[in-house]
Amino acid sequence: MPFVTASDGTEIFYKDWGSGRPIMFHHGWPLSSDDWDSQLLFLVQRGYRVIAHDRRGHGRSAQVGHGHDMDHYAADAAAVVAHLGLRDVVHVGHSTGGGEVARYVARHGAGRVAKAVLIGAVPPLMVQTESNPEGLPVEVFDGFREAVVTNRSQFYLDLASGPFYGFNRPGADISQGVIQNWWRQGMTGSAQAHYEGIKAFSETDFTDDLRAIDVPTLIMHGDDDQIVPIANSAETAVTLVKNARLKVYPGLSHGMCTVNADTVNADLLSFIES
């Protein structure tokens, strides 16, 4: 399997398919690059080069006991980009991966980034603070941490079968395969990485990163996202990025890249080609 060694020696797994213009994908917590299957296949079949890595401690990347913070996540992405010699890249991030994209573009992307896409992304800041009163109370994330410690396997089943894909909504078209694949990805990763990653995605303030992004940016968000509520994420982020456009998807969930892949893929392709 292909790996790149990050600056601190951590082995980062990546996929690299196709030979056209590069599109790089950044997955969400606590998943892996496999979460992008629908997008990778869709774009590689249309002549694009697609790259997706597993975040440290996630998927097939090394389960190291350190560096589970957004600065390391962005630096690891930069190591993949440098290793492959990528330029003119469109970076696509979902959820926590959207935060990774924001920090990567702001700190490492000069001269290499063509466009950015943030899907159901956590920026600018998830947790409630004095300066972010509309954020989610820290007790929400304390509950996540407790669930990871107590019974991570059951917690991941509950997330996937409930709010992540909107399977808890009346009339939802529930897919056991989607649920099991989410659980499989989560349980492949490191419990420590996932535990510490909760702080990374919930308490990192991306305001300055968003302001530093100077490439065309598409922000995509479902208005029934129960994991990253749209009001304090996408609707704020679009006001901070200089050249951003927000597309809202009525009734769609946090997991729309999987359960509404046709819709997401069509809009993603349109933005890439614009």
UniProtKB/Swiss-Prot annotation:
Keywords: Oxidoreductase, Peroxidase. The active site is at 95, 225, 254. Its EC number is 1.11.1.-. The keyword Transferase does not apply. InterPro entries: AB_hydrolase, AB_hydrolase_1, AB_hydrolase_fold, Epox_hydrolase-like. One of its GO terms (molecular function) is peroxidase activity. The keyword Oxidoreductase applies. Residues 22-254 form the AB hydrolase-1 domain. Pfam families: Abhydrolase_1. Belongs to the AB hydrolase superfamily. Bacterial non-heme haloperoxidase / perhydrolase family. This is Non-heme haloperoxidase. It comes from Rhodococcus erythropolis. The gene is thcF.
